[in-house]
From Swiss-Prot:
EC number(s) recorded for this UniProt protein: 3.4.21.92
Reactions mediated catalytically: Hydrolysis of proteins to small peptides in the presence of ATP and magnesium. alpha-casein is the usual test substrate. In the absence of ATP, only oligopeptides shorter than five residues are hydrolyzed (such as succinyl-Leu-Tyr-|-NHMec, and Leu-Tyr-Leu-|-Tyr-Trp, in which cleavage of the -Tyr-|-Leu- and -Tyr-|-Trp bonds also occurs)
Localization, UniProt: Plastid, Chloroplast stroma
A cellular component annotation (GO) from this entry: chloroplast stroma
Quaternary data: Component of the chloroplastic Clp protease core complex.
Name of the protein: ATP-dependent Clp protease proteolytic subunit
Composition skew (Low complexity), residue ranges: 90-100
Top-level taxonomy: Eukaryota, Viridiplantae, Chlorophyta, core chlorophytes, Chlorophyceae
Region Disordered, annotated ranges: 73-100, 182-209
Residue ranges constituting the DOD-type homing endonuclease domain according to the UniProt record: 590-728
Gene3D superfamilies, per database record: 2-enoyl-CoA Hydratase, Chain A, domain 1, Hedgehog/Intein (Hint) domain, Homing endonucleases
Amino acid sequence: MPIGVPRIIYCWGEELPAQWTDIYNFIFRRRMVFLMQYLDDELCNQICGLLINIHMEDRSKELEKKEIERSGLFKGGPKTQKGGTGAGETGASSIQNKKSNSSSFEDLLAADEDLGIDENNTLEQYTLQKITMEWLNWNAQFFDYSDEPYLFYLAEMLSKDFNKGDARMLFSNNNKFSMPFSQMLNTGSMSDPRRPQSTNGANWNSSEQNNSLDIYSPFRMLANFEAQDYDFKQINPSLASKEEVFKLFNNTILKNGGQRNNNMSKLLTELAQRNWENKTNSQENLYKSTEKALSQRNLRKEYIKDRTLNNYSSDPFNTKGYVNAQGASTGPSPRTRGMHADGSLNYLDFYSYNDSYNDFKTAPRGKQAERAFQEEESKKVFVIINSFGGSVGNGITVHDALQFIKAGSLTLALGVAASAASLALAGGTIGERYVTEGCHVMIHQPECLTSDHTVLTTRGWIPIADVTLDDKVAVLDNNTGEMSYQNPQKVHKYDYEGPMYEVKTAGVDLFVTPNHRMYVNTTNNTTNQNYNLVEASSIFGKKVRYKNDAIWNKTDYQFILPETATLTGHTNKISSTPAIQPEMNAWLTFFGLWIANGHTTKIAEKTAENNQQKQRYKVILTQVKEDVCDIIEQTLNKLGFNFIRSGKDYTIENKQLWSYLNPFDNGALNKYLPDWVWELSSQQCKILLNSLCLGNCLFTKNDDTLHYFSTSERFANDVSRLALHAGTTSTIQLEAAPSNLYDTIIGLPVEVNTTLWRVIINQSSFYSYSTDKSSALNLSNNVACYVNAQSALTLEQNSQKINKNTLVLTKNNVKSQTMHSQRAERVDTALLTQKELDNSLNHEILINKNPGTSQLECVVNPEVNNTSTNDRFVYYKGPVYCLTGPNNVFYVQRNGKAVWTGNSSIQGQASDIWIDSQEIMKIRLDVAEIYSLATYRPRHKILRDLDRDFYLTATETIHYGLADEIASNEVMQEIIEMTSKVWDYHDTKQQRLLESRDSTTSGADTQSQN
C-alpha cells in the first residue's frame, strides 16, 4: 500500500495493481502529501512514514557524498608555500582554500590536486619521521649526542612540524645562535690539521670546497637548536678558552636582565652573522653568495611573470572590474588582484596568478548549476491541507516530521485547516506557507478553571494553583469508572480576559472558560451511565447530570501495630513488644471510634514497694450512647485489649497502643487520618467511615442523611476523601456561625461564637460492625441530638468538664447558609480554647444517599433570573489554571462541592497547544513552541485575541503568523510551475532508470540467445 495516499484513492480497488506503482511514485518520488481528512493515527503514520523515508533517502545521499570526500579520491591537499613573504600571500591563500572547499567533485576532476599527491607526500613524511624518531629514541641509550653530532642534527630536524611554512628551510627563526655547528660540538680540535684552515682559524668552510659560501649552511646546522637546553662548556671543553665567542651574547643578555625574547634572538642572530662575515677571508666569496641568491629570486620572478602573461593573453589587465555570474560587480578582476596600481604584478603574491583558474572552477556554469539547483528543489515536500484536524498528538507528529526535510516543505491550505491541521500548516518552511483566499483556519482557545477551585490529590484537597508535577491527582477512567492517583503531565497557568461559564446547584459549583470540557451525561435516563466530555458553552440552559462518585478498586489492607521498647523493673532492662497484626474490621471500628472521641494520657505514679515513679500509658475512649458502648466492648474484646470502664470512659493501659495513637492526639482542631487509610479497600473505607459516624455527635436531618461535625478543616477534607473511596460522594459547605452549641459529652449546651464542619452521611450506605449483623445500629433513632436553647449554660460553667480532644458540638439552628464568596481559614492551634472557638470555622460535609446513582441534576431555565441554581456567563479578567494528565478527567471542587471534570488534553483537539502557547514565548522545549516559533507573535497579543475558538480568514491567518502569503492566482501559477519542474525532473530521472534497466535486460537476453 502506498505511503501517504488519501483514502479516496483506496476506492480504486485492487483489480488494478499496476496503478499502485504509479501512485507510489506520485506520492513518494514527487513528494506530494495530501492531508484531506480527519487526522487519525492511520493517516498520520502514513504521512510521517513518507516524510521519514524522504529524510532517510536525502540523508543517505549526503553521507555518500561526504564519504567520497573523506576518502580523498576527489580531495586535494593543502599547498605548502615555497617562497615569498608578501602581504597578500595570506589573503590569497585563504581565498583559494575557501574556493577549493566549495568546489564540487566534478570540478575537482580537472584540478591539480586530483591525485592527492600532497596528502600522500605528507603521509610518507609523517611515517618516516615517526619510524626514524622511534629508532633514535631506542638507540639514544647507547650513544651520546655529543659524540654523534649528525644524529643530534637528525633528531632536531625530525622533531620539526612539517605543516609549518618554514619546515623545509632547514633552519628556525627562533635560533639563538648562528655560529657554525662544528665549532660548538666536540667534533675535534679547531686546529685539526685535517680541517681546512683560514688565516684567522675561523673559516673552516673555504672556497676550495666549491660551495660558494652558502649563506644558509650555519643555520641548517643549527636548526631548532635551543641554547638554554645545553651546556656548551660541558659538550666541548675546548670552547672554554674562546671566551670572545660568548661575550657577544652575555653582555646583551645581562642588559636585559638575563631574559631572552624574540627581539633579543633577532639581535643576536644579526650580531652573529656580522661577526661571521667579518671573519671571512675574502669579500669576493660573500659577493658571489649574495649575487647567487639575487639571481635565483630574479629568475623566479621572470618565470612567474611570463607564465601569468601567457595565461592572460586577452585583456591581461582588466582593471575595470569583474562581473560575476549573477551580474553583480565584485571589484577588481582576479587577474588584477595581485597587481599594483600601475598594472605590474605583485610578485610577493606567488599564488595570485592562479586566482583566475580558481574562479573558473567555482563559478556556476550552465548545465551543472541548473542541475544542482533542480536537484535541490526536487527535495522539497509539498503538503496540501484540507482537514478539520484530529488528534493533537498526530498533529504534533506531522509538524515534527516536516522539520526533518532539509530542503524544506511548502504547505498549502485549500479549504479548512482546523485544530491539529493548523499545526501542519504552521509546520511548513517559513516563507512558503500558503492559504487560499477562501480558506479558514481554526485554532482553539485555552480552557481552564479559576484559582478558587481545589483538586483532590494524595496530599488532600489543594488549590489548583498549587498543584505541581510531583503531586498525584485523582483521575477517572471513563471506561471502567475507576479512580486512581497519577502525576499530571503538565500544569497550566495563564492570564485570561473574557466570558466565563458559571454553574451553581445544590451539588455543583464550577467557574470555567466557555470551551472547558465538562464531564456530564446529557440524557434524561438515570440508568444511563455514559458520561462524555462536552464544552461548557454547549450545555448552557440544558439539563445535564454531573458525576461525582467513583469506584475505588483496592485490595484489602492489613494494618501492623509497630513494636515498642519498654523499660521494665528497677533493673532498667529494656524489653520490646513485637509488632502485631490486628483483625482489620475490629481495628478499623476501634480506630474510627477513638479518632472521633478518644485521647491518650501518660501518668507517673509512685510504687508502694520502692517509692519509685512508674509511667502508666493510657488510651481513653469516651462514649455516652449505650448502643455504641456495646460495639466498643465487642471490638476491644476481639482485639484482645484489656480495658476498664468508668462511667462514659473506656481506659486501655497499653504502651504499644499508646505509642502509636499519641501522635494523633493534638487537639480537636488538628485531627487527621493517617496515610495507611488511603490504602484501604472500598469495603474497609465504609467500615471506617461508619465508625467515625458512630463515635462523633451525629445530627439526623432526615432518614437518609447524617451530619458529622468537626472543628478540624484537614479532618473534614479527609472525611470527604474517605467518602469518595467508600463509593459515595460528599460536599463541604461553610455555614453561618451559631450562637448556641450543644456538647454531647457533658450533655449541656454551651455558648460559643464559632462555626463547625458538618458531615452529612447516608446511613443506608453503611452498616455498623457487630458480631451479629441483625443488631446493626439504627443511627437515626439513637444518635439524634437536639438543642434546647432555653436550658443552655455558659461555657465558663462547664469548661472544666470539656475534654480538649473530645469536644464535639452541634448547633440549635439547622438552617444552612452557604457562603460562596469566602474561603475557610486554616486553624493551626493545638488546643480548643475560647479564642480558638471564636476564630474557627464551621463547615458541613454532605454525603448523598445512593452511591451508585449519585449524579446531581442541573436544571437551568435561561429565561429565569440568574440565581444560585442557574448557569450564566460572567465577564472575568485574571489568571486561570488547568492540568493535563492521563484519562483526561480529574476531581475538582469549588466551595466544597466536588465533581469530575475534564482536563486540558483530549484526543481530537489541540486546546492544550494553545494553553502552552500563551507562554509562547518562553521558548521552552515543549510542543507548544510549534505555534510560538511559527507565528512570531508576542504573548500579550495572543492573550488578548484567544478568548474564543479562533476561526481565521486567510488574511487573519497571515496576520497571526500561521501562514505567510495568500495563494492568489499568480501564486498558484508559480506553485504549479514549480511542481511541474519537479515532476518533470523526477519523470526524466525515472525514465533514465527504466531505460538503463531495459538496456541491461536486453543485453542479458541477447547473451542468452547467443
